[in-house]
Regions:
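Functional transmembrane helices that form membrane-embedded active or gating regions
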Residues: 2-14, 69-71, 75-78, 140-141, ...
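Functionally critical transmembrane alpha-helices in membrane proteins and complexes, commonly lining
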Residues: 2-59, 78-85, 113-123, 340, ...
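Interfacial loop-to-helix transition and helix-capping segments at the boundaries
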Residues: 3-4, 29-41, 106-108, 129-142, ...
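Aromatic-anchored segments of alpha-helical transmembrane domains
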Residues: 15-22, 169-182, 242-253, 309-310
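Transmembrane alpha-helical segments and their boundary/interface "anchor" motifs
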Residues: 39-41, 57-94, 105-117, 144-146, ...
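Specific transmembrane alpha-helix
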Residues: 40-57, 138-155, 171-226, 259-281, ...
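Membrane-interface helix-loop-helix regions
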Residues: 78-142, 175-182, 192, 199, ...
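Alpha-helical transmembrane segments of multi-pass integral membrane proteins
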Residues: 201, 236-370
Length: 397
C-alpha cells in the first residue's frame, strides 16, 4: 500500500523549505508562513517515521534484515548527499582563485576539516561548531541515524507493542533534549539535530500505529477518491481543518516555544491525510503533485547549491556594474543579507525563477544521481545473495 497523498505533501513542503532559504527582498520573504517554513523539516521527520514503520515494522527480524535495511536507506540518501557536497568544492575553488572576495575560501562553513563528518553522516551530533557545506544535509545525517535507531529497536524489542512503547520513550527523550538544551526552540540542527529527528521520527511511528489501529477497528478506512460519500465529506472537512491548522501554526510558531509542538501537529496531519478521503487528497494525488513528490528529496538537497549560484551571480554583477545588489535587513531579530536590485515585484519574479531553477536541477539529479545511486546499492545487496527486505513503498527524506 502506497500513500500518494503524503507524497504530494512532501513535494510542497520541500518547495516551501527551499523558498524559506532564499533571501531576496520581495514579498515572499516577509510572508509569515514562508518565514516559518523551516518547520516543515519536522514534517519530513514525522512522515519518514510513518512510512518506514509501515514498510518495515514486521520485516526487521534478524541482523541480516537490519543490515539490508540500512544499506537500502543509505542508497536512498547518501549518493545525492555526496554529490551535492562535492558540487560545493568547485565553488570554493573559484573563490580561492578570485582576486578578492568577501570571505576566504575553504574556511568557516566550508572548512575541509568538516568534510569527513559530512561524508559519514554524523554532522548532526554536535561534532561541528555550526552548519557546514550543504546546509540542509544536517537533517539527512539525523534521519539516517534515526534509521539506525529504528533498526536496532526492532531487533532488540522483537515484539511490535514493545517497539511502539519504546518509540514513545524515544520520542519523549528527543523532545526533552531539544526543549532542555536548544537555544533556538525546535530550530536546532548541527548540535541537537539527531534528537530533534528522534522526536519527529518516532512521533511518525506512533501516528502510523494509530492509523493501523483505527483501520483495524473499522472506525475509519481509506475511501475511494472519486466517489463522494458522507464519509468523504467528513474527511474533506477534517483535511480542510488540518490544512488551516498547518498554515496558521507555521506562520505563528516560528521562533517561539510553540514550535516544540510541530511534530505533534504534523503527526495528526499525516494521520488525517493517510486515509486519503477528502477533496484535498484528490488534489494532492494528481500527477503534478506526484511528479514533484517523487523529486522532493532532490529539491531539498539541491536548493542550497542553487542559492549559492544565484548569490555568486549577484556578487559578480555587483563588481562589474558597480551597483549594489544586496541590502541588509533585520528579520526576526537577526540581520540578513538579501539580494535586491529592483522593485519588490522584480524580486518576487526572481524568487519564482529560483524555484523553477531548483525544480529543473532537481529533475536532473533525480534522474542521474538518485535513481542510479539507489540501483547501485540494490545491486550491491543482490550480489550478497541473502534474503532482503523490500524497500518502502514510499521513500521519504
Amino acid at each position: 500500500m502506497r500513500f500518494p497523498v503524503l507524497d504530494g505533501w512532501r513535494g510542497l513542503c520541500a518547495l516551501f523549505v527551499a523558498l524559506f532559504h532564499f533571501n531576496a527582498s520581495g514579498h515572499f520573504y516577509l510572508v509569515p508562513f514562508v518565514r516559518g517554513s523551516y518547520l516543515f523539516v519536522d514534517f519530513f521527520f514525522v512522515l519518514s517515521g510513518f512510512v518506514i514503520t509501515h514498510a518495515y515494522i514486521h520485516r526487521l527480524n534478524s541482523t541480516a534484515d537490519g543490515g539490508n535495511f540500512l544499506v537500502r536507506r543509505l542508497g536512498r540518501v547518501w549518493p545525492l548527499h555526496a554529490a551535492t557536497l562535492i558540487a560545493f568544492i568547485p565553488l570554493e575553488m573559484v573563490k580561492a582563485l578570485a582576486i578578492s572576495g568577501e570571505t576566504a575560501a575553504f574556511t568557516d562553513r566550508f572548512a575541509p576539516s568538516s568534510i569527513l563528518s559530512n561524508l559519514f553522516l554524523v554532522h548532526s551530533l554536535g561534532i561541528e561548531d555550526g552548519l557546514t557545506w550543504n546546509i540542509p544535509s544536517w537533517s539527512i545525517s539525523a534521519e539516517f541515524l534515526a534509521y539506525v535507531t529504528f533498526a536496532a529497536l526492532c531487533l532488540l524489542a522483537r515484539r511490535t507493542w514493545l517497539v511502539t512503547v519504546s518509540a514513545v520513550a524515544l520520542s519523549a527523550t528527543g523532545a526533552f533534549v531539544v526543549m532542555g538544551w536548544s537555544d533556538q526552540y525546535i530550530d536546532t540542527s548541527f548540535d541537537f539535530g539527531y534528537f530533534r529527528c528522534l522526536y519527529g521520527f518516532f512521533t511518525g511511528h506512533v501516528a502510523y500505529r494509530l492509523f493501523q489501529a483505527t483501520r483495524g477497528a473499522g472506525l475509519l478506512s481509506r475511501l475511494p477518491m472519486r466517489r463522494p460519500t458522507v464519509g468523504s465529506t467528513i474527511a474533506g472537512l477534517s483535511e480542510g481543518l488540518s490544512l488551516a491548522a498547518v498554515i496558521i501554526f507555521v506562520a505563528t510558531a516560528r521562533g517561539n516555544a510553540l514550535s516544540y509542538a510541530s511534530p505533534l501537529l504534523f503527526g495528526l496531519v499525516v494521520w488525517v491525510f493517510a486515509f486519503e478521503g477528502g477533496v484535498i487528497s484528490r488534489l494532492l494525488a494528481m500527477r503534478p503533485f506526484q511528479w514533484l513528490g517523487a523529486r522532493s528529496y532532490s529539491v531539498y538537497m539541491v536548493h542550497a547549491l542553487v542559492i549559492a549560484l544565484y548569490e555568486k551571480a549577484a556578487v559578480a554583477t555587483q563588481r562589474l556594474s558597480g551597483q549594489p545588489m544586496f541590502v541588509e535587513q533585520a528579520t526576526d531579530g537577526a540581520e540578513d543579507r538579501l539580494i535586491s536590485f529592483g522593485a519588490t515585484w522584480m524580486m518576487d519574479l526572481l524568487a519564482l525563477a529560483y524555484l523553477g531553477t531548483v525544480v529543473a536541477v532537481a529533475s536532473l539529479t533525480y534522474r542521474f544521481v538518485e535513481i542510479p545511486g539507489q540501483s547501485s546499492f540494490s545491486a550491491l545487496l543482490s550480489k550478497r545473495r541473502k534474503p532482503a527486505v523490500r524497500p518502502a513503498a514510499m521513500e521519504v527524506t
